[in-house]
A protein has these predicted regions:
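Alpha-helical transmembrane bundles and membrane-interface segments of multipass inner-membrane proteins
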Residues: 1-171
Length: 171
């Protein structure tokens, strides 16, 4: 008897819907925590200055008109708008990949989309992304970033490491 005859369409749709529900939840939670953190830091910054935590990390609001970690900041609105459109297209493509990928990749793409949507929202609402996590050690100073950047980085780096590891396993 063929395994194809035992295929249960109802269970397939149920599993697929659970996958998508998990991905939507991840995207929403990351977007939510990113928004809340940015709203809190913007509100605090209007009343006070930076938040000193320790010698390694502070919260200090910086408005980023570029892409990740303040790279490629633009003065002209044309370049800013082009980058924003490209980011929107990348988000749409990542959502497509979520629907076509294996479960672990769906989760990782969802972390990237959740963070990207947080920053995309800011680009549309404020014409800049509020970055506020300021890390430094002695004279070394890292780029200022936000919660969305953390999830984008974790998702992308984990996808890269996973793909390298799996390719090495196959070879």
């Amino acid at each position: 008897m063929s395994k194809l005859k035992n295929f249960d369409k109802k269970n397939f749709h149920s599993f697929f819907q659970k996958d998508i529900l998990i991905c939507i939840s991840i995207i929403f939670l990351i977007f939510f925590f990113d928004r809340v953190s940015k709203i809190k830091i913007i509100d605090h910054q209007l009343k006070n200055n930076q938040i000193y935590i320790n010698d390694f990390i502070n919260f200090d609001l910086v408005w980023n008109t570029g892409i990740g970690f303040g790279l490629l900041s633009f003065e002209t609105s044309l370049l800013y708008n082009i980058i924003t459109i490209i980011i929107g297209c990348v988000i749409i493509f990542l959502i497509y990949l979520i629907t076509k990928s294996r479960f672990i990749d769906k989760i990782l793409f969802s972390t990237v989309v959740g963070g990207a949507l947080g920053n995309f929202y800011d680009r549309l609402a404020y014409f800049a992304v509020p970055d506020f996590i300021d890390m430094h050690y002695k004279s070394f100073h890292w780029f200022t970033f936000n919660i969305a950047d953390i999830f984008i980085s974790i998702g992308i780096l984990t996808l890269i490491v996973k793909d390298l590891f799996i390719k090495n396993e196959k070879n």
